[in-house]
C-alpha cells in the first residue's frame, strides 16, 4: 500500500463530511433551542417569584455628615491679673512671700505702690497672731509651765515680730496722726498684759523688754504732737502756745488717756510712769499758760478803760 494513498472515494468522503457537518449543525440548533427554553423557563420562574413575593422598598441611602472644621483651641494659664483676682487672702500672701524670697529687690517697689494699711486691719492681724498663742496652749498642763512656754514659743516669736513691725509703722514720720499712733499703742499694750505669765526666765526677760520698748514708743508718739511743725508755727504767729496745746489737751481728755496709762502702769509694774508724767506735765503747762493768758487779758482791759467821761465830770465841778 502506497504512502498517502486514499482508499475511500472522494464522493463518499464529501457525502460523509456533509453528513457530519449537518449533524453538528442540528445538534447545535437543538442545544440553542434547549438553552433558550431553559433560560425562558428560569426567567419565567423568576418573574413568578417576583410577583408572588412583595417587593421590599429600597432603603434610603445614608448621607455622610460633613465634618465641620473648628478652630484649634488649647488650654492656657490664667493671666497674672486674673490669678491675683481669684486667689484667696492666704494664697496671695504665700505667693507674695515666695516672690520676695526669690526677688528681694521687689520689696522697694511694693512699699512704694502699696496703699497705707488701715488701723483696723493692722489690729486684726495682730489679734490673729495673739490668738495663735492662746489656741496652742496645752489643756492638761499648767499654763505657766516651761512645757507650755516651749510649745507656744514659735507662735509667741511670730506675735512679737509682727508687733515690732507694726509698731514702727505707726510712729512718725511714717504716721503723723498722733491719735492713730496712741490708739494703736494702747491696743498693743493691752495684748501684752493678756499674755500668759510664763514662769520661764527667758519669757520674763522678753516681757520686760517689751514693756520698756512700748513705753518709749508712747513717749515718741506723744512728743511728736508737742513738737509738730504746724503747732510751732501757730504758736509763733499768734504768740500763744496755748492754742496748740489746747488741741493736745482735748485729745487727752476725750480719749481718757491718763486713766488708760495709769492702768498700763499698774499692770506693767511701773513701766509707764514716765509716760504719765509727760502727759500730766502737758496738761499742767496748758493750764498755767491759759491762766497767764487770762490774767494778761484782764490787765489789758484795765488799761483800755475810757476815762474821758470821768475827767469831764471833774472839770465841771
Curated annotation (Swiss-Prot):
Keywords: Cytoplasm, Nucleus, Protein transport, Transport. It is found in: Cytoplasm; Nucleus. Residues 34-65 are annotated as: Disordered. GO terms for biological process: nuclear protein quality control by the ubiquitin-proteasome system; proteasome localization; protein transport. The keyword Cytoplasm applies. Belongs to the cut8/STS1 family. This is Tethering factor for nuclear proteasome STS1.
Amino acid at each position: 500500500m502506497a504512502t498517502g494513498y486514499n482508499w475511500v472515494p472522494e464522493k463518499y468522503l464529501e457525502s460523509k463530511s456533509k453528513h457530519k457537518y449537518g449533524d453538528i449543525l442540528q445538534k447545535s440548533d437543538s442545544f440553542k433551542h434547549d438553552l433558550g427554553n431553559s433560560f425562558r423557563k428560569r426567567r419565567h420562574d423568576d418573574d413568578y417569584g417576583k410577583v408572588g413575593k412583595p417587593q421590599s422598598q429600597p432603603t434610603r441611602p445614608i448621607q455622610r455628615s460633613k465634618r465641620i472644621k473648628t478652630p484649634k483651641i488649647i488650654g492656657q494659664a490664667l493671666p497674672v491679673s486674673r490669678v491675683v483676682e481669684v486667689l484667696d487672702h492666704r494664697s496671695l500672701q504665700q505667693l507674695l512671700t515666695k516672690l520676695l524670697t526669690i526677688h528681694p529687690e521687689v520689696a522697694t517697689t511694693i512699699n512704694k505702690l502699696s496703699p497705707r494699711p488701715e488701723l483696723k486691719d493692722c489690729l486684726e492681724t495682730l489679734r490673729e497672731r495673739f490668738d495663735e498663742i492662746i489656741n496652742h496652749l496645752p489643756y492638761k498642763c499648767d499654763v505657766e509651765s516651761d512645757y507650755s512656754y516651749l510649745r507656744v514659743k514659735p507662735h509667741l516669736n511670730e506675735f512679737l515680730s509682727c508687733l515690732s513691725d507694726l509698731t514702727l509703722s505707726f510712729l512718725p514720720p511714717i504716721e503723723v496722726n498722733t491719735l492713730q499712733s496712741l490708739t494703736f499703742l494702747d491696743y498693743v499694750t493691752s495684748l501684752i498684759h493678756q499674755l500668759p505669765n510664763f514662769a520661764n526666765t527667758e519669757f520674763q526677760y522678753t516681757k520686760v523688754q517689751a514693756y520698756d520698748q512700748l513705753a518709749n514708743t508712747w513717749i515718741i508718739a506723744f512728743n511728736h504732737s508737742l513738737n509738730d511743725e504746724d503747732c510751732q508755727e501757730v504758736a509763733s504767729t499768734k504768740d500763744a502756745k496755748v492754742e496748740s496745746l489746747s488741741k493736745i489737751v482735748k485729745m487727752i481728755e476725750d480719749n481718757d488717756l491718763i486713766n488708760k496709762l495709769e492702768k498700763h502702769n499698774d499692770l506693767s509694774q511701773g513701766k509707764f510712769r514716765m509716760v504719765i508724767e509727760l502727759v500730766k506735765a502737758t496738761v499742767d503747762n496748758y493750764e498755767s499758760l491759759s491762766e497767764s493768758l487770762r490774767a494778761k487779758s484782764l490787765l489789758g482791759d484795765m488799761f483800755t478803760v475810757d476815762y474821758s467821761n470821768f475827767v469831764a465830770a471833774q472839770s465841771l465841778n
